[in-house]
């Protein structure tokens, strides 16, 4: 039996308690900041199902340089501010895929995951395959029936429609100039011809809404286009009745034959006159270290 006289009561000062509390807070802060840093290196947003982590992160949104650009998805504010629209969309999709493993993406979202050129104006609502998602989807989501999605693939940890199914679904919906950017990048990625793309569309999409527009887009697609900006400006030439230019034509420097230059657009007129067109990206005027030329916002 233990007697009260044997019990020693030790009084812990408030200073010690505060120190322990501060230590726990510091450890939690360091742990979460490390996770945010690691997630940023992976090109994604931090997604967490842990209520303790979620409460800590939301308490510090607006402080500690932490932002919550989408519900349950977190990152450093300075990282988010530095991203392009396409980079933000790409990280959001990867974060959602981490938070909702049962989600699958199609359309413009899948095109981003496949590395295709998706103009900024097409970014916004999520494109999800209707696979019995575990949570209620927000308004504005574009749903696709599983039987229309076909076999799904996993790319960078994200479930998406196959490469060519993704391209087809985009071309069935995209306006001409936007669709041309996607089609050009698809040909460039796979090294196939516009004829191959037209045949795929005929075999898979004939009779569907948007098929005729998709075929027009495919008939002008050219894998030599180097970025979405070049594709969209070529689409404007086509739409306004100008001759379709040759792309990436090479010229030798008359002063140094070992140097070769390529031009974005080249026209040879009927009278023999040659016209060169160049699309200069913003990066050309901002890069100071001789890096590669940038492209305009598509």
Role assignments for model-derived ranges:
Residues 1-210:
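Short gly/ser-rich loop at a beta-strand->alpha-helix junction or flexible surface loop bordering the NTP-binding
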Residues 7-16, 23-39, 48-52, 187-298:
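Surface segments flanking catalytic/ligand-binding clefts of nucleic-acid enzymes
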């Amino acid at each position: 039996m233990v007697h009260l006289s044997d019990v020693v009561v030790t009084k812990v000062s408030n200073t010690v308690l505060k120190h322990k509390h501060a230590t726990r807070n510091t450890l939690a802060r360091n742990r979460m900041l490390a996770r945010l840093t690691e997630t940023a290196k992976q090109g994604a947003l931090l997604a967490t199902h842990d209520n303790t982590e979620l409460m800590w992160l939301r308490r510090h949104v607006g402080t500690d340089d932490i932002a919550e650009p989408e519900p349950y998805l977190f990152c450093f504010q300075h990282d988010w501010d530095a991203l392009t629209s396409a980079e933000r969309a790409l990280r959001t999709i990867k974060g959602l895929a981490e938070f909702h493993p049962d989600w699958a993406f199609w359309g413009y979202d899948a095109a981003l995951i496949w590395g295709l050129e998706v103009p900024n104006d097409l970014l916004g609502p999520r494109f999800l395959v209707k696979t019995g998602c575990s949570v209620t989807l927000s308004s504005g989501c574009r749903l696709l029936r599983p039987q229309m999605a076909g076999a799904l693939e996993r790319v960078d940890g994200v479930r998406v429609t196959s490469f060519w199914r993704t391209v087809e679904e985009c071309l069935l919906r995209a306006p001409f100039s936007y669709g041309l950017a996607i089609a050009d990048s698809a040909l460039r990625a796979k090294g196939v011809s516009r004829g191959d793309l037209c045949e795929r569309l005929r075999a898979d999409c004939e009779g569907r809404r948007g098929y005729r527009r998709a075929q027009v887009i495919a008939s002008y697609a050219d894998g030599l286009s180097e970025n979405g900006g070049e594709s969209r400006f070529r689409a404007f030439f086509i739409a306004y009745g100008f001759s379709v230019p040759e792309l990436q034509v090479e010229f030798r420097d008359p002063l140094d034959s070992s140097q070769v230059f390529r031009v974005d657009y080249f026209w040879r007129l009927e009278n023999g006159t040659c016209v060169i067109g160049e699309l200069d990206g913003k990066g050309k005027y901002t890069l100071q270290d001789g890096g590669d030329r940038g492209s305009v916002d598509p």
